[in-house]
Amino acid sequence: MERICEPELMDEPLQARAYAEADFSGSDQAFTARILELMACVPGANPSDALRILDLGCGPGNISFRLAAALPQARLLGLDGAKAMLALAEQNRQREIEQWPHLHFQLARLPLPPHDLAALEALPAGFRPPYAVIISNSLLHHLHDPAVLWQTVHQLAAPAALVVVRDLRRPPHPQALQELVERHASAAPAVLRRDFANSLAAAFSPQEVEAQLVAAGLSGFRVESVDDRYLEVSGQRPLWQS
């Protein structure tokens, strides 16, 4: 089936609240564990080090909070362009502010305009670019121009930075899409069922992502299918692009 773009930002309050209240704990924990596994294998991204980590498209902070809890010595910045989503993330951080001195959320939309880039560079030292680890969960399919994500990686990643991206992958036909919605969202609120279906239709195939990476000069990154609906992109930014 052909790709059908969806809105880039999830900025409806009802939509943001439904997403934040949904139970993604299983997939969120699996992605967090995968990030930590890859970090342990990459020189310069060791989980025991005081790293700068960037979560692109952090939404309400599901992955940001899990990773920050696992890496209290790191500095983690969550970036999102949706005010409604970021407000939920910041509310959760403020509830236990003493627990999260190493976690910060920032409003910014990709591609980063000069004023947003300047705002990042004005953050406290531990949160400024460049970043040793860049992660992203379910952002790519929202972007009408997927090259924006890979351009941002070049813009903000340190030399040899670890990049880990998880996203939905587009089903081959509408029937397969509906089967996934029924399998994974049959009991979800209508707004989540709608958004899940739209997101699956807006997602990319592994082959399309591989072509994006070649065009971006990131052909060394690995693209893998994960379970019945995700794909994973992982790799290190080439040193020669520093």
Regions found by a protein language model. Name each.
Residues 150-159:
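A short glycine-rich, Lys/Arg-flanked "PGG" loop and its adjoining helix->strand segment in the class I
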Residues 49-57:
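Conserved class I S-adenosyl-L-methionine
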Residues 168-218, 222-224:
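C-terminal alpha-helical "lid/dimerization" subdomain adjacent to the S-adenosyl-L-methionine
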Residues 160-167:
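Conserved beta-strand signature within the Rossmann-like core of class I S-adenosyl-L-methionine
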Residues 1-18:
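N-terminal, positively charged/glycine-rich alpha-helical extensions of SAM-dependent methyltransferases
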Residues 54, 62-112:
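Class I SAM-dependent methyltransferase SAM/SAH-binding core
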Residues 135:
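A conserved beta-strand element that flanks and buttresses the S-adenosyl-L-methionine
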Residues 25-48:
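Conserved alpha-helix/loop element of class I SAM-dependent methyltransferases that forms part
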